[in-house]
């Protein structure tokens, strides 16, 4: 397959010749320019890179996490360099890029995330709807940030007994679409702010009519259930603690029962409670798994309890709701995609200032959404479940596509896009259908003969002396 190469004039400026089709499909330059104008973030001088390209650069920081700050920009222009008339293409230094990021600020990336990241699944998307409702899930995580005084002061460190987390951490709570793994809203806070405080903010502003939100037991409350039903015309399915909502008012045909809740200052809401156990042999094997350090040891006889605002057992049978709640683990996989495969687990966020940390987080979410959007388009084209496409393979394909899009002429872009969509679902890379699997919540820890690093244990530099000057014989 032969493609035409784009032609550049000798007067072309880098800012206008660069093209990011992989990103621009969802973040078109017109939209980014509009947000830059609204946030007064264009800057007085254009310099080597205008702020439009700085926005794309911030998103690319998460797509190419293995590269340092300056190398990310070099990677973005690697295709264009072969067409550039001047062989000595000078690019901004890492310090200059950080300066431009400070000028850009956080609002532009936040508004771009809010405008772009919406639920993407259609009625034809496999696994995206149940009971006529769009499946959503909410969950939180802690992300490590660069160990600087500013980050430590703003975000803080988690502690357990005598031990403190080695790096400052930021609390992130996400609302994601289950079928596509698209994160559609997020809130960030210092690490000591609990998920229970952040989740209501996320639910009140992001949940839309026709959604079924899957929640863990730490988030669900009578107030949230009332708000979802009466104010947002949405529904919830959540796990319950052992002593919650145990006074049955009416037992239904499938064994579930109804309870009326009266949250303070809000309308009463009727909910349905479902109880079930795991088959004894499997439950005993699961009980042998080590539990996390923050949870109780599992009991093989444990009674599992769910609560939902779907009251009709004919419309939503209890067994189907139990199967549906199992889909909440998709948001765990979604968080793993961005922490492990995009951000490369074990490495903190790059930014050394709180404002730039928030900017980087929005860039990370946009990068994850863009990867997932391309995967969803490819899966729908072939009538596949998006779960069958490999996320790591998709990141590699889009990495290569950034180079190819920069080389080809504009009239060739539709053909390159079709090849990209086909590459994403290459048969050899497709994942098998999901299987029922259980794994203990354990991690491998690297052994080290060295002492744990404490706060304040820093090295020092002798700027005016060499090793020869301090040597005594």
Regions found by a protein language model. Give the residues of each.
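Extended, structured, electrostatic nucleic-acid-contact surfaces
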Residues: 77-87
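Single, function-defining residue in the core of a domain
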Residues: 1-75, 102-104, 111-115, 131-134, ...
């Amino acid at each position: 397959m032969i493609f035409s190469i784009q032609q550049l004039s000798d007067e072309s400026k880098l800012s206008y010749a660069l093209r990011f089709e992989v990103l621009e499909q969802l973040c078109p330059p017109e939209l980014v320019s509009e947000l830059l104008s609204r946030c007064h973030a264009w800057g007085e001088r254009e310099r080597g890179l205008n702020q439009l390209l700085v926005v794309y650069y911030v998103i690319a920081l998460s797509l190419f996490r293995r590269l340092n700050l300056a190398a990310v920009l070099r990677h973005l222009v690697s295709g264009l360099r072969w067409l550039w008339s001047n062989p000595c293409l000078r690019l901004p230094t890492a310090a200059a890029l950080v300066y431009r990021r400070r000028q850009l600020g956080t609002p532009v990336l936040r508004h771009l995330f809010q405008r772009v990241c919406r639920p993407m699944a259609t009625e034809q998307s496999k696994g995206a709807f149940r009971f006529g409702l769009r499946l959503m899930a909410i969950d939180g995580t802690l992300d490590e940030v660069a160990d600087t005084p500013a980050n430590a002061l703003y975000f803080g460190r988690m502690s357990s007994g005598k031990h403190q987390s080695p790096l400052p951490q930021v609390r992130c709570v996400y609302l994601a679409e289950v079928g596509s793994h698209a994160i559609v809203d997020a809130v960030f806070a210092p690490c000591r702010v609990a998920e229970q405080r952040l989740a209501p903010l996320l639910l009140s502003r992001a949940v839309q009519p026709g959604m079924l939100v899957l929640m863990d037991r730490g988030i669900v409350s009578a107030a949230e259930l009332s708000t979802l039903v009466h104010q947002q015309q949405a529904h919830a399915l959540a796990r319950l603690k052992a002593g919650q909502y145990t006074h049955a008012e009416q037992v239904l045909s499938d064994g579930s029962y109804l309870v009326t809740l009266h949250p303070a200052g809000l309308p009463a809401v009727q909910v349905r409670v479902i109880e079930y156990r795991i088959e004894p042999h499997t439950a005993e094997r699961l009980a042998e798994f080590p539990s996390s350090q923050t949870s109780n040891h599992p009991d093989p006889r444990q009674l599992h309890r769910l609560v939902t605002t779907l009251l009709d057992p004919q419309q939503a049978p209890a067994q189907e709701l139990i199967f549906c709640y199992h889909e909440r683990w998709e948001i765990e996989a979604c968080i793993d995609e961005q922490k492990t495969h995009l951000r490369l687990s074990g490495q903190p966020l790059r930014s050394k200032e709180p404002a730039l940390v928030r900017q980087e987080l929005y860039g990370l979410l946009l990068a994850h959404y863009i990867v997932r959007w391309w995967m969803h388009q490819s899966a729908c084209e072939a009538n596949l479940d998006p779960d069958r496409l490999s996320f790591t393979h998709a990141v590699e394909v889009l990495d290569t596509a950034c180079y190819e899009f920069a080389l080809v002429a504009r009239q060739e872009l539709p053909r390159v896009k079709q090849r990209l969509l086909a590459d994403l679902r290459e048969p050899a890379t497709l994942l098998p259908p999901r299987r029922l699997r259980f794994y203990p919540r354990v991690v491998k820890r690297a052994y080290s003969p060295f002492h744990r690093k404490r706060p304040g244990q820093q090295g020092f530099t002798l700027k005016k002396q060499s090793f020869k000057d301090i040597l005594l014989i």
